[in-house]
């Protein structure tokens, strides 16, 4: 009986921790300011699209050769960053 209780406790813990991780990832897309997106995307080229309150990041920083650009390149695989836009738009 003790073994079943321990397994049940572990299962509940796993469920609760996975729920909180999914919640944290979903919150990253929602924004009200550009600063929130820069923090969530971990790059300076991110901004908040106020039409849908979603973080957007541009890849133009990766395409430049100028070493004086202060922007950090956005990491396209970063989960909390929202959607990509082309620098040609």
Curated annotation (Swiss-Prot):
Disulfide bonds join 31-48, 37-55. GO terms for cellular component: extracellular region. Keywords: Antimicrobial, Disulfide bond, Fungicide, Plant defense, Secreted, Signal. Transmembrane segments: none annotated. The keyword GTP-binding does not apply. One of its GO terms (biological process) is defense response to fungus. The keyword ATP-binding does not apply. Its main location: secreted. Residues 1-20 form the signal peptide. It is found in: Secreted. Belongs to the DEFL family. This is Putative defensin-like protein 254. It comes from Arabidopsis thaliana (Mouse-ear cress). The lineage of its organism: Eukaryota, Viridiplantae, Streptophyta, Embryophyta, Tracheophyta.
